[in-house]
Amino acid sequence: MVASTLSPPTRGWFDVLDDWLKRDRFVFVGWSGLLLFPTAYLAIGGWLTGTTFVTSWYTHGLASSYLEGANFLTAAVSTPADSMGHSLLLLWGPESQGDFVRWLQLGGLWAFVALHGAFALIGFMLRQFELARLIGIRPYNAIAFSGPIAVFVSVFLLYPLGQSSWFFAPSFGVAAIFRFLLFLQGFHNWTLNPFHMMGVAGILGGALLSAIHGVTVENTLYEDGEQANTFKAFDSTQEEETYSMVTANRFWSQIFGIAFSNKRWLHFFMLFVPVMGLWTSSIGIIGLALNLRAYDFVSQEIRAAEDPEFETFYTKNILLNEGLRAWLAPIDQPHENFVFPEEVLPRGNAL
């Protein structure tokens, strides 16, 4: 008998750290967590701080914090002043020079929340990739989450980068987002943009598919319990199906004359529709950043200008957009000191 004197191979610090990060725990950390948790913490903390204490008086001429009397719907972390351009507004940068209060007054907190928020979303996507790899499933969760990331990055970062400054990005607040929607309509005619139309079709179509799928499964559950509530009859370890795909197919074939017969294709379609809606709307926002125009039906505008009795919903919307620009711009951009004389303000044909 020979006694072995070989010692087990030593493990480096990287292997030890890798094991610790990937350990099975209540809240998975992983390598992606090194990006996700700090950035998400700082973004959410920055937003809570801004909506609680920080004014927008110096950037927008507005009260935007709980301290000033705003509520949950009207509080916001507002975009930096237009004069700041596309500066990263670092606390130690030339604008603030290390003065924390001045940094808040200039809108530095918005850049802080936007950039950390973007990296937090990317970290969450990487988290889904990492966990899918570890437990051996496909990465479609992460691929689908690219939709919300595309929307956030295009709306909060790429759109203002195409405009004159961060000022024209949405501020982080409920009413602030509504203001941004009105701005997009008035200055870009966003609702007539085909990419917006595809986005609406994708999001509402995804909601419709989700509702149809849910009720179809509920309608075709096997009668495997004694109670009216069927939830308790389900066992997560059961081998047999819990609902009848054949019956569902028969039902929708009679309703529409066509139905899904392949569960895999059905669920891919449910993934594809809303994610494609998010992607297409993001492409449209990038177009707006470059000031690309939506559909222009010039012939209708010319005829409406020549014929007081001719008006379409399109020409009416064009006048509404002119009104939005004329009355929104002086309030939205007080630093420009816009003054529009009465004769240039839009009027409907009926006037």
UniProtKB/Swiss-Prot annotation:
Co-factor binding details: The D1/D2 heterodimer binds P680, chlorophylls that are the primary electron donor of PSII, and subsequent electron acceptors. It shares a non-heme iron and each subunit binds pheophytin, quinone, additional chlorophylls, carotenoids and lipids. There is also a Cl(-1) ion associated with D1 and D2, which is required for oxygen evolution. The PSII complex binds additional chlorophylls, carotenoids and specific lipids.
Positions bound to chlorophyll a PD2: 196
Transmembrane regions: 39-59, 123-139, 151-164, 206-226, 277-293
Oxidoreductase among keywords: yes
Protein residues bound to chlorophyll a ChlzD2: 116
SUPFAM superfamilies to which the protein is assigned, alphabetical: Bacterial photosystem II reaction centre, L and M subunits (SSF81483)
Binding of pheophytin a, residues: 128, 141
Domain of life according to the entry: Viruses
GO biological process terms, semicolon-separated: photosynthetic electron transport in photosystem II
Reactions the enzyme catalyzes: 2 a plastoquinone + 4 hnu + 2 H2O = 2 a plastoquinol + O2
Keywords: Chlorophyll, Chromophore, Electron transport, Host membrane, Host thylakoid, Iron, Magnesium, Membrane, Metal-binding, Oxidoreductase, Photosynthesis, Photosystem II, Transmembrane, Transmembrane helix, Transport
Entry binding sites for Fe cation: 213, 267
EC number: 1.10.3.9
Family, similarity comment: Belongs to the reaction center PufL/M/PsbA/D family.
Subunit structure: PSII is composed of 1 copy each of membrane proteins PsbA, PsbB, PsbC, PsbD, PsbE, PsbF, PsbH, PsbI, PsbJ, PsbK, PsbL, PsbM, PsbT, PsbX, PsbY, PsbZ, Psb30/Ycf12, peripheral proteins PsbO, CyanoQ (PsbQ), PsbU, PsbV and a large number of cofactors. It forms dimeric complexes.
Role, per record: Photosystem II (PSII) is a light-driven water:plastoquinone oxidoreductase that uses light energy to abstract electrons from H(2)O, generating O(2) and a proton gradient subsequently used for ATP formation. It consists of a core antenna complex that captures photons, and an electron transfer chain that converts photonic excitation into a charge separation. The D1/D2 (PsbA/PsbD) reaction center heterodimer binds P680, the primary electron donor of PSII as well as several subsequent electron acceptors. D2 is needed for assembly of a stable PSII complex.
Protein name (record): Photosystem II D2 protein
Organism: Synechococcus phage S-WHM1
Gene name tied to this protein: psbD
